[in-house]
């Protein structure tokens, strides 16, 4: 089993911030297939048992590979971390180089 933390892209504000109170958690039982649409905000799957979990993620070819161009440090480019990968982080996560645009509680699955 695992939990997916999901949000809607249209809830991202014009300044690229996102209110974490809009996140919904979904329990995905083992053996279940899930499609996450391109307009879905999501975080890495979360384990619900100390033994962890295994999952398969299928992405378009080239996704998460190194950028082949110089991005600008403004607008949506601030969120781009790799090909087809945008990241809005929480300040508490202290992810080097990430755009800290998650506002509100830093959600944890306990």
Model-derived segments and spans:
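Aromatic-residue-lined binding/catalytic grooves and analogous aromatic/hydrophobic interfacial grooves
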Residues: 36
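Active-site region of the double-stranded beta-helix
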Residues: 1-30, 44-52, 56-110
């Amino acid at each position: 089993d695992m939990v997916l933390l999901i949000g809607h892209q249209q809830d991202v504000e014009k300044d690229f911030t996102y209110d974490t109170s809009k996140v919904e958690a979904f329990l995905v039982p083992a053996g279940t297939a899930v499609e996450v649409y391109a307009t879905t905000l999501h975080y890495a799957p979360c384990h619900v048992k100390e033994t962890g979990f295994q999952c398969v993620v299928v992405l378009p070819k080239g996704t998460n590979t190194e950028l082949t161009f110089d991005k600008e440090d403004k607008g949506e480019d601030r969120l781009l971390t790799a090909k087809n990968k945008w990241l809005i982080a929480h300040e508490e996560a202290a992810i080097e180089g990430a755009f800290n645009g998650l506002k509100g509680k830093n959600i944890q699955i306990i």
